[in-house]
Regions:
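Terminal leader/tail segments of proteins
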Residues: 1-63
């Protein structure tokens, strides 16, 4: 899986099948990869992200 932050409040995730998913940064969806929060040169996702959003993210990417 690849992750890219475009600097415009949108984070693109490209899964192993090359499907692109877009998440709004402002919704504070946590990027949970290998159990860690992924930080970018710019804004980062915070651990205070709601459990609902975390669950949605995990379900979307099978984490």
């Amino acid at each position: 899986m690849k992750i890219a932050y475009n600097g415009s409040n949108c984070v693109f995730l490209i899964d192993d099948e090359q499907n692109c998913h877009c998440f709004s940064y402002t919704s504070e969806v946590a990027a949970i990869i290998d159990g860690k929060y992924v930080e970018y040169d710019g804004p980062q996702f915070y651990s205070r992200t709601s459990n609902k959003h975390k669950s949605m993210f995990r379900a979307q990417f099978g984490l």
